């Protein structure tokens, strides 16, 4: 559902603008969609960002993989390592990629265990929220939206697009949706 949608959006966007897919979930399951990676991953880039003797910008290109029209950096494999990344580090990572690499759009496939989730959502120009037509799923979506409001992040809902999952979507509709990801308020392209 959600990951497949994010990857398809990455494919569509990458046809017209340099786009990078990042999976920020504790348990990404990305090896279902992409080849198993035993090499370096997003955790290595975060490590390089902390080292004064290593320029992390040079490492970005060595960490990029490409599959089915999507550029991506393999996600952090160990969930405990993922949980140790702070919201400041996530923000520094996004800034580094957007300011120092070729990528103009980053597709974030977010899970609820990422530190600073609401801050990351706040940076996005569009937030796609998938859901299924099922009672418990709707209750979870309503609870998520209420949590955003009560935590002072209600503005995120104004740029949220709900996407019903379960039935294959029309590729033309997906392309039209993908084209709506445009500008970050300060003029930089972000997602």
Residue ranges and their predicted role:
Residues 29-30, 81, 115-117:
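Flexible loop/turn segments at secondary-structure boundaries
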